[in-house]
C-alpha cells in the first residue's frame, strides 16, 4: 500500500495525467460534440476521422461527448487524487519544515550549508546584534538567541506550490460539477416567438421572448454579427399579477461574444437561420410558409416546395440563403425559372403570379447553466496566485558567534535565485564589518 501511495503521489504521474487530459481536450475541441449518432455514422463511417476513428468507434469510445465521458472524468478524478496525495506527502511537509525554526548551535553545521563564511571579529557578540538589526531593517524574520541567530525571508514561496495544487483540485471539482449538474439547450426563435424554461418540479420558471433579430452583413453579403433583442420574465407564485407572472421583466440585447448572464444562466448568440417566407399567390391573402434547410443545395440554403396548381401539381422550389434574398425559383426538373426579391414585383410561374412579401430570420440561442463556473474561477484564481507566490525565493540565514576564538560564522540556504543570494550574503558581512 505504501508503494502505491508513493507512486500515486509522484509528481511525474501528475504531469503525465495533465498531458493525457490536454490531449483528450484537444480531441474534444477538434471533433464536433454532442451531435446525433446518425450524423457521426454518416460523416465518418466512409471517411474515418484522422483516418483512424470511424463513426461507430467514435460512439463506442465516447468521443462524441469527451468532456462528460466516463474515461475523461476518471482521468480528472485520478489527477485530483494524485495532486491531493502529492500535496499531503510532499508540499505540506516541506511547508511545515520551512515554518519550523532550525537552531544550529555548532559552526560545523553551518559549514555544510550551500553558502558559508567565517570572519574574524574582535566582538563576535556585537556582530550578531548588528546582523540582527540589519536583517530586520530589510524585512527578514529573525529569531535571536545567546550567541547565535536564525533568519528567514520569502516563506510565502513555500505556500505557492500547495496553493497551485489546491487551485487545480478546486478547478477540476468545478469542471466535474458543471458536466454532471449543468444544462445546455439550443433553440431557434423567430421574432415574436417565446419559450418557457421549467424548473425541476415542472413549473414555469422563466419566459424568454425574442423581440427582434438583426443580421449584420458585409458588402459581399456574408454575415458578420447577429443581434437579438430579448425580453426575460420571471414566473412564479409570489407577487403574481392577474396573468400569473411576476412583475419583473428584463430587456437586453445579446450578440456574438456578448452573452447575457441572468440568475446563474448564460444566454449566447450562437447561430442564425431562416424561419419562414411570406408569399402571395395571385390574389390570395399573404401566406407565411415555414422554411426547411436543404443541405444538398449548400451549407446555408433554405427553401420550401410550393405547388402552383390547385391539385398540387407542377411544384416549384423556392430556395434562398439570405433574409435579403434573392429567392431562386426552380422547376421540378432542377432548371432555374426566375429570381424573386422580398418586397419586389410578382413573377408569373406556371400561369400563377407569385410575389414574396418578406423573409423571417430566426435567432439561434444557446442557453447554458453551469453551477461549477464559480468553482472553476476560484480554482483558477487560487492556482494563479500560487504560481505567483512560487516565484518568491525562500532564503534562510544562520549565524554563530565564537567569543573565545573571536570568530563569526554565517551560513545560508536558498531554494531559487541562488546566484543573487550568493551575492547578497557577502554584502551583509561587508556591512557588518564596516559598522
Swiss-Prot record:
Disulfide bonds: none
Name of one Pfam family that matches: ResB
Membrane topology annotation: Multi-pass membrane protein
Localization annotation: Plastid, Organellar chromatophore thylakoid membrane
Main location: plastid
Transmembrane segments: 11-31, 69-89, 159-179
Protein keywords: Cytochrome c-type biogenesis, Membrane, Organellar chromatophore, Plastid, Thylakoid, Transmembrane, Transmembrane helix
GO terms under cellular component: organellar chromatophore thylakoid membrane; plastid
InterPro entries in the cross-refs: Cyt_c_bgen_Ccs1/CcsB/ResB, ResB-like_domain
Record keyword Transmembrane helix present: yes
One GO term of the biological process aspect: cytochrome complex assembly
Keyword Transmembrane: yes
Subunit structure: May interact with CcsA.
Physiological role: Required during biogenesis of c-type cytochromes (cytochrome c6 and cytochrome f) at the step of heme attachment.
Similarity comment text for this entry: Belongs to the Ccs1/CcsB family.
Name of the protein described by the UniProt record: Cytochrome c biogenesis protein CcsB
Originating species: Paulinella chromatophora
